[in-house]
Amino acid sequence: MFKPQQCALLVSLACAGQAYAANVPEFAGDPVVVTAGRVAQPLSRTLADATVVTREEIEESGAQTLQQVLSRQAAVSIASNGGPGSASSIYIRGNKDSHTVVLVDGVRIYSATLGTTTIQNIPLAQIERIEILRGPASSLYGADAIGGVIQIFTRKGEGEPRWNAGVEFGSRGTGKLSAGVAGKSGSTAYSLQFSHAQSDGFSATNSRNTDYYNPDNDGYRNDSYAASLTQTLSPGHDLTVRLFQTFAEADIDYTNAWKGQDRSKSRLTGQSVESKNRFNDVWTSTLRFARSQDKSEEFHNGDFDRRTSFFQTTQNEWQWQNDLSTKLGVFILGASHLDQKIASDGTYTKNSRTTNAGFVSYQLELGKHLLQASLRNDHDDQFGGKMTGKAGYGYRFADGWLARVGYGTGYKAPSFNDLYYPDSGNPNLKPESSKNTELALQYRKDGRSASLTLFQNKVEQLIQWAQTNPADSNSWRPSNVDRATIRGLSLEAAAQWLSIDWQGNLTLMDARDDKTGSWLANRPRQSASVSAAKQWEKWTLGAEQQVASRRAGDATNSEAKALHGYGVTNFFANYRFAKNWTATARADNLFNREYETAYGYNTGGLGVFLGVRFSQ
């Protein structure tokens, strides 16, 4: 933590300078990203591997789920245990799904028992923008950010009231409804958005899944809302309240109790109160209290009176961030206090955890040179203190070009299930840690962009299930048994050619267990995505192609559980038939390919979806 004298010195240094205009994009169409440095900055000046997905891009593509949107991004792969509403895992740069932090409007959404986030229950209708940060970010966001951060921003109010609504129907009994309004009246900005989705689904499991195979249709239902209210108390001083909730019900085939246990209910909630105060051209303070809850229940044969499992995580977090913009650069000083508590129908020997953290970050632009550094100390009441850091340097050697190098460390504390799950937890586990190095070359100018990133991440104390006593078949426990090295490169490009908007990416990756030499499960060694969209009068026509190579389906790389490579083609069309009105169409898996992203679990065949959207 910082001493008062050190803070005073930084404040006095800041007040001596002029405002640092780091949040003003240089190039037309240069997206602004917040997640990469905890302050707004143009993507072209960001010393991190980051991507911004806008509302316009989501609507144009007609994507059905958040998993679809994420799977099209470079160095991001998704493994799903079936169709809509099924458990899904995110692998950023080949890191474990528990190595990704997911934020909704700055609020961490997380299951402290599983150690992951139920992204399958976050509907696209609520999303205004998605920011994806690849690489270690523990020095900015604390535990779990070994692989990266995904931040979801819900819709915000500004200007005249803008209404939106949409309806969509399609294959497998799919139906969606959404409606909302956002705007500003005087000194009050507001937004309110509702959505509903349902599907009859398809069988989550296939015959390769000998433990849980149940050839029925696994349906899904999701209801959600998001709301925000911002009151400007005086110029530069805003008070904001945000609410977010999704409620989902799903048929499931992935439980490990018995095959008949096949219904689940889950709820994600997030609430926050934030005071943002710009005291002068130098100092901006943001104080936030956030509360989130992840609740999941499972039931036998759809009988909601016969609950068979229950897990709930409640998180309360205070966070204070101070941005000091000076002619010497941008200083960020912050502190946070996080309380996590779990509840379950099982008995855990410990059900709460407290983490206190202090962090500092620095950003400088000096001529053609860019510098960013951050340092954070997290003190966990179970594991003590953990220091993480990150440093990056960039050189703008030509108009639109940036070469950069970076190094960072990350860590993850074991989940409550890893530590204390009844009869199988291991309270002696140590946190996982990582060291990441990357080199990148990127170009962004006049609506064209390209980047090449080389990365290597070494993860130590990797937690995997292991047999602690070879003579006892019941002695399997989570254990710090492995180290892993993940090397790779990602290539991205976007441009207009022949009056067609092109976007594409390619990822090559070598992700291995250092101890055994085996490939890490569910990580494709090669993957690529390309999309093309053509606007013609009132029409937008487009297509997507996604390919992924062969992958290991388990940690032992057994041939019987291998996941074969695949290629999937999607098509979309939009027709603007009146002011603010658009008819939409999308075909997923146009050629009805059969493939798996997780061993023993199906993906959807050909699906056709038609809709109408109103948007002011």
Language-model segment annotations:
Residues 1-71, 183, 232:
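N-terminal Sec signal peptide and the immediately downstream disordered periplasmic leader
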Residues 66-69, 86-91, 100, 118-123, ...:
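N-terminal periplasmic accessory domains that precede
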Residues 67, 71-107, 128:
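Extracytoplasmic beta-strand/coil segments of soluble accessory domains associated
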Residues 107-134:
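Short acidic/polar hinge/loop motifs at secondary-structure boundaries
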Residues 138-139, 151, 158-160, 166-168, ...:
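Periplasmic-side early beta-strands and strand-to-turn transitions of outer-membrane beta-barrels
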Residues 230-248, 265-396, 451-454, 496, ...:
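Face-selective signature of the C-terminal outer-membrane beta-barrel domain
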Residues 257-278, 311-316, 381-382, 396, ...:
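Outer-membrane beta-barrel signature, preferentially recognizing the C-terminal barrel domain
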Residues 328, 332, 365-370, 456-458, ...:
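Gram-negative outer-membrane beta-barrel transporters
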